[in-house]
Amino acid sequence: MTIRTQPRKVNAAVVNSHQQMSFHDLQLKAPHQNEVGVRIVACGICHTDLGFLSEGSILGHEGAGIVEQVGSAVTAVKPGDHVLLSYQSCGQCAPCHESQPFNCEHFAKLNFGFQRLDGSSAYPEGVQGHFFGQSAFANYCLVTEQNLVKIAPEFPLEVLAPLGCGMQTGAGTVLNTLKVKAGESLMVMGTGAVGLAAVMAAKIAGAKTIIAVDRDPARLALAIRLGATESINSDEENYLATLCPHLDYVIDTTGIGHLDELAQEVLKEGGTLVRLTGSCGETLTRGRKAISVVQGDSVAQDFLPRLVDYWQQGRFPVEQLITYYHFDDINRALKDAQNGKVIKPVLVWD
């Protein structure tokens, strides 16, 4: 059977010269044989989006929607299927073949390079798309089987959209990278979406001590509701004196430079500091180690269904982190995210 794919008119939020979003109608080329055209229903805003506000770019990488078109080589989904979108990988290199797409040899090109693997683009000249293999700040985008996950149609796309990046990173760090065991202890520095996902995952794992550190009392209170056993306000004088030493793990979501010193104070010998910001610090001592993690060492097709299951069970209540905005309000949503007014903004179409 011949599968015919077609170009499609797309309404997309494009970064303008003032680092604001302006909506434009664009003509997107037909999907390649390995691509899937998805009508976007909702998309989370991640802080990574805020770092790529270059003129002419279409951002957005926590998309969720409904399949409209499939290329001739696509077997995982069909038109009408509901999908969550995640990071892109090539599916061809050694790490991908070893079920480590988060270590894909082409990760930077495919997620931050605004291009397909072959260097081409489906977008008009002057417009940069394919961000994280998505560019989901639009009502339609092209993805591949590598960065979509099919879910049941009864699940709310607007609730589950944020799972594909930040939530996956925080929860995956706990469950995949560290493999936290019942009775272990950890501290989470920063209670944004990534940090709170780590808190929820630590509770799922059965951690005995879960310490949330932040300067926002409301977020610390939410962390307690989501499973933290203790909260510490880093704005309070002598807060270091209240910290419990001999922790198994510290997860830094903030990139604040003095964290390595703090980790030395609270980590047990042989403990692990996880940096989720890509920042570097001094070498740790006495058997302690510092590692960085990409996407929570998660294979989205395996891990996102786990998170959906936890959400169904009420153990991963992501909806408590979300503030909704219509796509028309994208600039307000981005500003609120940048100012820390909201934890996880999610854009929705009508």
Regions found by a protein language model. Give the residues of each.
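C-terminal hydrophobic helical "lid"/dimerization subdomain
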Residues: 1-12, 301-350
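N-terminal Rossmann-like NAD(P) cofactor-binding module of classical short-chain dehydrogenase/reductase
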Residues: 84, 250-251, 274
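Glycine-rich phosphate-binding loop and adjacent beta-alpha segment
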Residues: 257-316, 349-350
